[in-house]
């Protein structure tokens, strides 16, 4: 497992952001994105994106919106030798921020459509089964993911309908799904993580060019 801990060099003139500015910007952005929603469940993998999302929502709850009911749901796919370590990291991350944490282990059947598609199907089945009434699911896809989605659609020869972008507010399997980070880049999330001194997991499979998204990145 690769565990990343990022701390910012505040003397670098190219990056004038400090921790207070980062927290204020992030919480303001998230408050706008969640609107009147108050029962929030974050799909928490422990990676950079979901770590920033979850930490930002916890900060929003603690400083501005105490009525927010925030929890984290981690999916243990069992596909990596480090899967147990990832789950333990996520649990500790949540404990540090007083966020209720739960994890669900799934069996990924990759016979039809490959590992990526099978893992995604398994995740969303868990989400549908575990969300409470009026609870909103939040996932942490960002601007780079949005661009990759478009490029993958082109690579696969999708028609106009298949080239549509991910929606920031949608409905999946009967529940509401918010993606509040879609207009922020990975570089911006790295800035937030640095200023907030977050630690996160780097999945070793992200460097495996056999997976379509990684092929575009490498």
Which role fits each region the language model picked out?
Residues 15-218:
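Core alpha/beta nucleotide-donor-binding catalytic domains of modification enzymes
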């Amino acid at each position: 497992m690769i565990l990343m801990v990022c701390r910012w060099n505040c003397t670098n003139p190219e990056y004038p952001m400090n921790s207070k500015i980062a927290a204020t910007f992030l919480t303001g952005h998230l408050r706008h994105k969640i609107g009147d929603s108050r029962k929030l469940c974050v799909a928490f993998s422990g990676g950079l994106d979901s770590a920033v999302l979850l930490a930002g929502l916890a900060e929003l709850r603690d400083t501005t919106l105490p009525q927010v009911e925030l929890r984290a749901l981690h999916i243990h796919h069992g596909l990596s030798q480090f899967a147990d370590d990832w789950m333990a990291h996520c649990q500790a991350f949540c404990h540090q921020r007083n966020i209720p944490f739960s994890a669900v282990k799934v069996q990924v059947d990759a016979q039809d459509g490959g590992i990526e598609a099978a893992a995604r199907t398994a995740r969303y089945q868990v989400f549908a089964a575990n969300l409470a009434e009026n609870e909103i699911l939040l996932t942490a896809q960002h601007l780079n993911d949005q661009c990759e989605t478009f490029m993958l659609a082109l690579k696969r020869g999708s028609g106009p309908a298949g080239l549509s972008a991910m929606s920031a507010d949608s409905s999946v399997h009967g529940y509401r799904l918010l993606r509040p980070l879609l207009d922020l880049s990975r570089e911006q999330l790295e800035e937030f993580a640095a200023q907030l001194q977050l630690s996160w997991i780097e999945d070793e499979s992200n460097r495996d060019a056999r997976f379509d998204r990684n092929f575009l990145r490498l």
